[in-house]
């Protein structure tokens, strides 16, 4: 076994991990990045459509173009990294953290003062949404179908049904249509699309692909291969209405039914997770409840845009490097509270008055709202106020403020009310 020592270890070589490693390096830390796949870039390697980088670079880039800019900078800085490497154990000890890594070079014992969790997220599967029927070939997550088409150059279907209107599902509806497949429809159990409005228009409406709201797949037919699926409309409690059932012949069912942050290593280290985001509970520096462990990107919460993933990677890397310098004051955290009837989640969940001033806050509304004013306050002092013409659970919103630590006297509250 080989033993290695670093200031910061970054787990994940996608857009968040690359940004975190670059940021930590630029702030003086000795960094190791660990990536389990054979190439850097994360999921962006297979996202050949454009639309990335509008916020970060002010231009429309494909996924490989966006990640390529970070990879080139990362390599030019000479930051140490391991690909085809998997963390099998992680523990906190008196002088930092010890990670056991299985790699092509053998078993590595990696020690560090800080760890950045940037492992991204994974897709829900058919077993996690309780679809009845056999388990024939032809049931894919949207990401798997995307990998077949964009990386392997293979067509996984000629006639498919897509369950769920997440962004990847809608993007794959367009991609499969362009490659000659027939997409019978996109079926969404909720009464509003789950993905961005621009994807509804650009991927579905522009290609005449039908979107069926308040409808779900209830059964899969086929033994060796998918032959058909049963779809039903649902009531207000999202229970299938049996009288509306109909059979749709197809050779594949593609699932776009949500994403889950990857936090197995975080849990090994004792990181507390937020039931709302399925990611870590953090303060504005993105440090978790375990001192020295930071979380960013889709491992923290599922983002709509990769630009925000990179932004949180920047913050986590900078914070990890500062933590390693050892001059951080004792934490003085106040909780961030919000109305759970109106907000699905708010990140960060705490504000540390002893840490870096200012805050970038992310939130997702629980449903559709029109003409709303969102206020972040401490006591009677409004720290941030922003007005929104439209709010939707399909789109994450961002609030920013500087120089607020001296104004925080009590817990922070996030509220939403009709604009006057």
Per-region residue spans from a language model:
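FAD-binding core/adjacent interface of flavoenzyme oxidoreductases
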Residues: 1-11, 68-159, 235-243, 254, ...
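Beta1-alpha1 glycine-rich phosphate/pyrophosphate-binding loop at the start
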Residues: 6-69, 73, 147, 155-202, ...
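A Rossmann-like FAD-binding core segment of flavoenzymes
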Residues: 74-101, 177-264, 357-390
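Predominantly flavin-linked oxidoreductase catalytic cores and closely associated redox partners
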Residues: 108, 114-211, 216-225, 292-295, ...
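FAD-site-proximal beta/loop scaffold in flavoenzymes
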Residues: 117, 139-149, 252-303
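Mid-to-C-terminal Rossmann-like scaffold of FAD/NAD(P)H-dependent oxidoreductases
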Residues: 307, 315, 319-387
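Short, aromatic- and glycine-rich surface loops/edge beta-strands on solvent-exposed regions
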Residues: 361, 374-376, 401-420
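Aromatic sugar-binding surface patches on proteins
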Residues: 391-400
């Amino acid at each position: 076994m080989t033993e290695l020592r670093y200031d910061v270890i970054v787990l994940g070589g996608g857009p968040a991990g690359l940004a975190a490693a670059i940021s930590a390096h630029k702030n003086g830390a000795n960094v190791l990045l660990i990536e389990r796949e054979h190439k850097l870039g994360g999921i962006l390697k297979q996202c050949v459509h454009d639309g990335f980088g509008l916020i970060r670079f002010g231009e429309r880039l494909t996924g490989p173009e966006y990640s390529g800019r970070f990879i080139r900078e990362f390599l030019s800085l000479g930051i140490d990294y391991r690909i085809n490497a998997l963390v099998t154990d992680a523990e906190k000890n008196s002088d930092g953290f010890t990670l056991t890594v299985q790699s092509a070079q053998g078993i590595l014992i990696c020690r560090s003062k800080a760890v950045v969790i940037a492992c991204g997220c994974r897709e829900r599967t058919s077993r996690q949404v309780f679809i009845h029927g056999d388990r024939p070939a032809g049931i894919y997550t949207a990401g798997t179908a995307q990998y077949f088409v964009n990386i392997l150059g293979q067509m996984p279907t000629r006639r498919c049904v897509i369950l769920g209107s997440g962004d990847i599902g809608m993007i794959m509806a367009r991609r499969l249509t362009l490659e000659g497949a027939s997409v019978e429809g996109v079926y969404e159990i909720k009464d509003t699309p789950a993905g961005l409005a621009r994807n509804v228009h650009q991927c579905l409406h522009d290609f005449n692909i039908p979107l069926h709201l308040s409808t779900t797949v209830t059964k899969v037919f086929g033994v060796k291969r998918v032959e058909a699926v049963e779809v039903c409309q649902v009531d207000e409690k999202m229970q299938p209405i049996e009288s509306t059932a109909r059979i749709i012949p197809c050779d594949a069912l593609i699932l776009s039914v949500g994403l889950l942050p990857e936090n197995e290593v975080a849990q090994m280290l004792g990181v507390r997770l937020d039931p709302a985001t399925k990611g870590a509970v953090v303060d504005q520096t993105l440090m978790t409840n375990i001192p020295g462990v930071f979380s960013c990107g889709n491992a923290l919460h599922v983002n709509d845009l990769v630009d925000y993933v990179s932004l949180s990677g920047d913050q986590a890397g900078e914070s990890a490097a500062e933590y390693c310098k050892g001059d951080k004051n004792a934490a003085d955290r106040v909780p961030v509270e919000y109305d759970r009837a109106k907000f699905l989640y708010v990140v960060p969940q705490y504000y540390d008055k002893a840490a870096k001033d200012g805050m970038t806050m992310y939130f997702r509304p629980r449903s559709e709202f029109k003409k709303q004013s969102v206020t972040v306050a401490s006591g009677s002092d409004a720290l941030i106020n922003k007005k929104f013409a439209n709010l939707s659970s399909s789109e994450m919103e961002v609030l920013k403020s500087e120089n607020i630590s001296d104004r925080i006297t009590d817990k922070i509250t996030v509220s939403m009310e009709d604009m006057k």
